[in-house]
């Protein structure tokens, strides 16, 4: 009888904890946070920020580009990040709201960055600038600034794993792995490292599945829609069904190609009450390039096929240039 009583109480406690300390918030929450002097961080590129941002929001430019090495896509040296965040007045230990454009992973990367460096009072405004503008809230064109702060950042090991730690966790029944890449990446058809494939035991749930309409970016590209409303999150019950194969009490490691897309799913899982979520920061770029790390559906880049297609493309370019030159010559003779 005690066990029957204890389990529902545990579930209620977890639900209450999520409600009291959400990871993902709406515009009303952001407005209230601003009123109590929370920091608002706009992670979009500088050009987007300059066209209009939440009044008082600060910017360091495109956070994912500024804070990561362009080759490895891992974080740059911690002392450099200390200077960048410090000059912007971004202290991870303050209350911070992170936002970007609706649904994009960039805001979640900001969340993960702050958690990685010890932040525990950080939220994501998923619907971002579009929702804020639609609600008629204050927008500014003037850059906001906070007083600089001296930072000494330390990595929080509870929110991330290294490649070595990832390999050590393979076949651990208390660990579950989520691959948020496309299905083509997962099965090795789309190769973005030395080899394609996926980590053994991982289940594939592309991060776009968190949205009401995962096809929204493609529809925008095809001009089948004019807004990104479909990139709002699914209702909580739908998200719970999406991740019903997972145990919220187990260690859950999320990865993608470089730790960017996975940060969004990590944030969603935190919102759903998963208690031990980690982002594999180096993700497949690190794992796929570690050739002695076990992998499934392994494929390798076909250099011969690539060269053949490149040669065919060059032939086509040469033909078009020849046709263009002939057309110009004929035109000049008239």
Predicted feature locations:
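Rhodanese-like catalytic fold shared by cysteine-dependent sulfurtransferases
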Residues: 19-39, 46-97, 101-176, 180, ...
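Bacterial N-terminal signal peptides
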Residues: 5-16
């Amino acid at each position: 009888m005690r066990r029957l009583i204890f389990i529902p109480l545990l579930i209620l406690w977890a639900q209450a904890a999520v409600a009291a300390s959400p990871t993902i918030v709406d515009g009303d929450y952001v407005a209230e946070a601003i009123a109590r002097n929370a920091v608002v961080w706009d992670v979009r590129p500088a050009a987007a920020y300059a066209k209009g941002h939440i009044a008082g929001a600060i910017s360091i430019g495109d956070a994912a580009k500024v804070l990561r090495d362009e080759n490895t896509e891992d974080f740059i040296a911690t002392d450099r990040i200390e200077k960048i965040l410090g000059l912007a007045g971004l202290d991870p230990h303050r209350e911070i709201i992170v936002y970007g454009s609706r649904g994009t992973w960039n805001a979640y990367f900001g969340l993960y960055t702050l958690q990685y460096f010890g932040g525990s009072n950080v939220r994501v405004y998923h619907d971002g600038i579009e929702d804020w503008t639609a609600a008629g809230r204050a927008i500014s064109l003037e850059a906001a600034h906070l007083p600089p702060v001296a930072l000494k950042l330390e990595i929080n090991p509870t929110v991330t794993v290294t490649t070595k730690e990832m390999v050590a966790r393979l076949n651990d029944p208390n660990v579950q792995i989520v691959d948020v890449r496309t299905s083509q990446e997962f099965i090795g058809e789309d190769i973005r490292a030395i080899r394609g494939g996926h980590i053994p035991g991982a289940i594939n749930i592309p991060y776009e599945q968190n949205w009401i309409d995962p096809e929204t970016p493609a529809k925008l590209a095809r001009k089948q829609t004019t807004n990104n409303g479909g990139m709002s999150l699914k209702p909580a019950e739908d998200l719970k069904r999406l991740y019903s194969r997972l145990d919220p009490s187990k260690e859950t490691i999320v990865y993608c190609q470089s730790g960017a897309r996975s940060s969004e799913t990590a944030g969603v899982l935190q919102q759903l009450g998963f208690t031990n979520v980690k982002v594999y920061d180096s993700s497949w770029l690190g794992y796929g390039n570690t050739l002695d790390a076990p992998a499934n559906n392994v494929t390798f880049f076909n250099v011969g096929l690539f060269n053949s297609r490149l040669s065919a493309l060059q032939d086509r370019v040469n033909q078009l240039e020849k046709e263009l030159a002939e057309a110009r010559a004929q035109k000049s003779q008239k």
